[in-house]
Amino acid sequence: IIGLELGQVYSTLGTDVSVVEYMPSLIPGADDDIAKPLIRKLKKHFKSIMLSSKVTNVDVGFKEGVRVSIESNNEIKDQVYDKVLVSIGRKPNTNLLSLENTDIKIDSKGFIIVDDYQKTSVKGVYAIGDIAGNPMLAHKATHEGKVAAEVCSGLPAAMDSKAIPSVVYTDPEVAWVGLTEKEAKDKGIEYELGDFPWAASGKAMILNASQGKTKVLFDPETKKVLGGGVVGPSA
């Protein structure tokens, strides 16, 4: 996602951008119909998009630029670029916290292990934010801080990771939260769907955002919202 966000910025500034994505889709976490308007626009912005592909080698000493070896369809080809932006994820910097001098437990990836109340393995010690595990999002860290503070104060609070919204700051913006329609189908969960195409909205037409849409999944009996997605300005 970071690669798409920054890639679109560079593309808008006039740079030819090629994207190499290991997964078979650019935004695997969102439903296809929510991601489709963005992907349609990115195909116009970017010089090329290589899905189900991976970078196997980068030669920064190549005199004509940066030579990148890309594997796709069991075939490796070399491409030469001026610059390479690596945006395959982040890792926690818990190695700088001297946790080996404490009884605080971390997982195999270096994240501090916490429960739904942000409690660590040491009584009275809480962890929030990027060091407490994925997703590494600012709004997730903020809410974790609130949960930890309320638990410390003796108030009933807990973290519900399913309620963490995901956001893609591209043009158009994409956001989704809770259960996606694909997840509901895969898990056999019954749902009803509220689907609103922005082409029916006068304001969306004024904003030149008629390709946007909003969808909400809800329980057919209780009418409880199970999830939702939006694509368009201010999603």
Indicate where each model-derived feature is located.
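Short loop/edge segments at beta-strand edges and connector loops
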Residues: L51-S53, S108, D195
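Rossmann-like dinucleotide-binding cores of NAD(P)H-dependent redox enzymes
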Residues: I2-E75, P135-T142, E150-E183
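Flexible, glycine-rich terminal cap/loop adjacent to redox cofactors
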Residues: S153, T170-A235
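FAD-site-proximal beta/loop scaffold in flavoenzymes
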Residues: D78-V151
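Short loop/turn motifs at secondary-structure junctions and domain boundaries
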Residues: F62, L96, D103-K105, I206-G212
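A short alpha-helix-loop-beta-strand transition element characteristic
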Residues: K105-D107, L155-A163, I189-G194
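Short acidic-glycine loop/turn motifs at beta-strand connectors
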Residues: F62, S108, P220-T222
